[in-house]
Amino acid sequence: VIDAFDPKLLSILGEGVDVIIDGTDNFETRFYVNDLAQKYRIPWIYGSCVGSCGVSFPIIPGETPCLRCLIGHLPAYHATCDTAGIIAPAVQMTAAYETTEALKLLSGEKPRDSVAVFDIWQGEHHFIKAGKMKNKDCPSCGGHPVYPALQSQSSADVLCGRDTVQIRHPGAFELENMAREMKAGGAAVEYNGYLMITALEGHRTVLFPDGRMLIHGTKDKREARSLYQKYFQ
């Protein structure tokens, strides 16, 4: 399917599905998938990787923690495939974990109840029990779910007369941590406690704690959203 992504399209694609395998490259889309899977009780296999590292976990609505529960327990990396690269074996290992769990589900076998975390370069594989990660107040899988990803999404608006696109992130930005990690990666960053300024592929970019992001030097929403997804998803 070639189309602009939105929750309505995802809901149509989700009809009659037995299991969803994560092949996405950003968390905005993953949270949509997570909430759709919770709402319609569809098992899905989360998987992501960057560099030589990867993570995978089978999410079963009503039984396991969902992605929103897990995210606070997983390593907080702002690196992406665009900023840090990725080696093919990490992709292949992540896909192997995901497809194995999908085959278990489709054949009636019980999937594992632990999060697989690996660094294939170092030869390290760990399995972390996930049961205690479940949040009873989670807005996606708790006692009173509201499925926030299906209600809100990042928006992009061209600012009149300023050759600038404003992106509004669904949540807040942790600017201090982001500035520190981007500096460690060699990026030129200014941070003063109130905002962060950097450059993304030649575009001066300003980020605010409330989730607003200004990308200067363009009026193209598609280009601005692409930069946002590359560096801050």
Task: Provide a role label for each language-model segment.
Residues 178-185, 227-230:
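Residues that form generic nucleotide/phosphate-binding pockets
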Residues 201-233:
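Generic C-terminus detector
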Residues 185-209:
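Cytosolic Rossmann-like ligand/nucleotide-binding regulatory domains
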Residues 1-8:
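Conserved SAM/SAH-binding loop
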Residues 9-19, 23-170, 175-180, 189-194:
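Glycine-rich phosphate/adenylate-binding loop
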Residues 121, 168-170, 198, 208, ...:
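A structural detector for beta-sheet-dominated domains
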Residues 4, 24, 218:
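Conserved residues at beta->alpha junctions
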